[in-house]
């Protein structure tokens, strides 16, 4: 009794073979630079980007020219071909050694062990130039493959999945709170995602009236004025006030004649006369003299 259908196994084997054949298809590199998948076999005469002057297509042409130069100038030697199941097995050799007619398998052949690693001949210069060009093309092909497959960097995908998990937790918590409705459940404000667009785009809150009142009643800074220069009129006014205070001390009553100072001697009568004259001038100026 058969447990599996042999027809389905045959169909699966054919599908695997067809998939393997599709994976082995080679496409035109110039068309790949412009986002088109065109099989390379027999496509060169009909390629619309055959003379494209862009940087990527220029690298393709430079590599073709370098391969032609190396094939014409290097010493040809026929390596022993190996076959497996009727197909040739790829057995790469060191490019620098092959340019000088020496066949050394590339596997296990480090650059420090190569005898032509410091050679600066024309062939080795072409080999190094082609190596750098191939590295740039491989980097370009990988980026193109990632863009075609729609792959994103792992960091972005992890962050995206983490954000989705957080959103699911928030939705689950809010739904459970609505169903249970207990006071021990967390509040919606605590379960809301702080990075949601509604919160990030909220307008700024208006200031409270109390804060505005305090802001309006703030004391102004004390002004500092420059010193006023003393003019002659102010000086004379101060002298008159000082003289008036002296005369008032000497003569308390207005109608009484100003007496001589008790401490003035006979030899200093002139000083008393001057003070009496000042007193009379004071009374005359202010209209107090009869």
From Swiss-Prot:
**What induces its synthesis?**
Negatively regulated by lin-41 which causes degradation of the mRNA encoding this protein.
Give positions of region: Disordered.
Answer: 139-167, 179-202
Instruction: Please tell me in which tissues this protein is expressed.
Output: Expression is undetectable in hermaphrodites, but persists in males. In males, expressed in cells of the tail tip.
Q: Which residues bind DNA?
A: 28-74, 94-142
Protein keywords: Developmental protein, Differentiation, DNA-binding, Metal-binding, Nucleus, Repeat, Sexual differentiation, Zinc
Pfam families to which the protein is assigned, alphabetical: DM
Identify a single GO molecular function assigned to this protein: DNA-binding transcription factor activity, RNA polymerase II-specific
Q: What is this protein called?
A: Protein male abnormal 3
The gene from which this protein is expressed is mab-3
């Amino acid at each position: 009794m058969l447990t599996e259908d042999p027809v389905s196994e045959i169909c699966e084997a054919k599908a695997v073979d067809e998939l393997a054949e599709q994976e082995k298809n080679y496409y035109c590199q110039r068309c790949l630079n412009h986002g088109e998948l065109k099989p390379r076999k027999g496509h060169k005469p009909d390629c619309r980007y055959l003379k494209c002057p862009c940087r990527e297509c220029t690298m393709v042409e430079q590599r073709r020219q370098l391969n032609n130069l190396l094939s014409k100038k290097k010493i040809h030697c026929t390596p022993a071909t190996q076959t497996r199941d009727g197909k040739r097995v790829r057995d790469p050799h060191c490019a620098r050694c092959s340019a000088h007619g020496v066949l050394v398998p590339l596997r296990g052949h480090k650059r420090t062990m190569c005898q032509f690693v410091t050679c600066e001949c024309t062939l080795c210069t072409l080999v190094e130039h082609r190596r750098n060009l191939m590295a740039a093309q491989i980097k370009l092909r990988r980026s193109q493959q990632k863009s075609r497959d729609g792959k994103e960097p792992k960091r972005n995908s992890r962050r995206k999945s983490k954000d989705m998990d957080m959103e699911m937790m928030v939705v689950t918590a809010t739904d459970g709170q609505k169903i249970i409705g207990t006071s021990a459940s967390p509040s919606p404000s605590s379960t809301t995602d702080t990075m949601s667009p509604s919160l990030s785009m909220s307008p700024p809150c208006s200031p409270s009236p109390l804060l505005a009142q305090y802001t309006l009643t703030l004391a102004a800074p004390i002004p500092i004025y420059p010193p006023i220069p003393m003019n002659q009129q102010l000086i004379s006014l101060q002298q008159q006030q000082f003289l008036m205070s002296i005369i008032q001390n000497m003569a308390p009553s207005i109608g009484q004649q100003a007496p001589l100072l008790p401490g003035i001697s006979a030899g200093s009568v002139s000083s008393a006369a001057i003070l009496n004259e000042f007193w009379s001038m004071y009374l005359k100026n202010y209209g107090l003299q009869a």
